[in-house]
Amino acid sequence: GDHRDLHSCPTRRSSDLGRTVTALSLGCGTGAAEIRWAETGRFSRIDAYDLSAPRIARATQVAEQQGLDHILHYAVGDIDRLQIADNTYDVALVEQSLHHFSPLDRVLTAISRSLKPGGLFILHEFVGPSRFQWTDRQLAVVNSLLRILPEKFKTKWASAEIKKEVFRPSRWRMHYNDPSEAMESSHILSQLAIHFDIVELKEYGGTVLHLLLYEIAHHFLPGDPEAEKWLALFFEVEDILLQTGELPSDHIVAVCTTK
């Protein structure tokens, strides 16, 4: 399915419960996803948290403007310090934020305990190498494609610099740029299996495309036949490598239920 399916998953799955539901959302940012969920009429209450006060302020403002503040309740909160009541929510939602949380064991325990019996945990996540320590095979594939790509497609966004090679970042650099980035991402799937029953898992790649197109994706817009030809090649290469098991998927959508 396309990217819209990723966002419809929480609504589709919550509707399976046959009633309006209460939801917990962690790492909500400016609340764009939560707005979409609230608009469906499937949720009676969504409690959403993020570390950033400016983002929460923006999310709250938009909810009020859209007349959804009776459903959406935003607050600044750190997952390590949140006092989430047990057996409270029908659904827990995490979109591209779980890979910023650590220790995973404690976080997933808290999420599991917050759910009612039979509750759903729905996540859309990066599950690739922790601290972006890309594998040798992954880098070899990406850089092989980059080498054959014409230079006109390799100028970086808002820059004259040419993207020549993708490297594995140093752990020091990763910690310096963002101490929370991908701390335990490679352990997410194994930890999920410990704390939840995984009832649906969709892998959608990104193992090649994410690294390859980072900073140069603006060249590959609809309407340019040559760019579309290259993009089709990139998708084909990644799809084949995923299908054959040569590379794992770095991104997933999963629906889990409490054990």
Which positions does each model-derived feature cover?
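Class I SAM-dependent methyltransferase SAM/SAH-binding core
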Residues: S25-L26, T30-R81
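C-terminal lobe and adjacent flexible extensions of AdoMet/dcAdoMet transferase-like proteins
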Residues: H195, V199-K259
